[in-house]
Amino acid sequence: LLFYYPLLSGKVLFQSDIRQYDGMSRQLKDYRAQTGEETYWIDNAFGGMPTYQLGAKYPADFLSPIYSFFRILPRPAHILFIYLLGFYLLMTVLKFPWQIGLFGSMAFGFSTYLLIILQVGHNTKALAISFIPFVIAGMLLLFRKQWFWGFILTSLSFAMQIRSNHYQHQSSVLNILSTSIALGVYNII
């Protein structure tokens, strides 16, 4: 909270990519305001493109209430919170003492690259990265035969990771999951 104190006092972090997003998604927002309906195609960006990356809303989005829980903090402080929480949970699942878990989560959350992508507004990338420790922690719980919590954590965090809408890191998580499953099957055989 101290790191993002200016945000908590009402100031707004200028994120260049978010400003560009506002321009790219203007037609989508105007259409939604005029008709009350959702469009999945706009023609003002790149000569026409789908709106899946520009803030389209989906009727069966059950993950929004979960994501709203993290949005109690202003953007992008809420993403930093998810970084810290996810890595601390991973360290806890790995059975590190809480002091090492706290230090590890601070080292992860305040690493230079993760802060830079927040500064410039790569929020979807940051969100995708923030849920990776949750996915890994869930997989570890599954390997330890803690089926219920492992399934809940893996499926919810992977769904949130997909919801972040950043395909590059979704493929990375799929690689982690498939490698983990392959190693698990190998150890069983």
Question: Where does each model-flagged region fall?
Answer:
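Membrane-interface coil-to-helix junctions
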Residues: 1-84, 106-133
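Alpha-helical structural context
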Residues: 34, 69, 93-94, 163
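Membrane-embedded helix bundles of polyisoprenyl
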Residues: 86-89, 93, 99-188
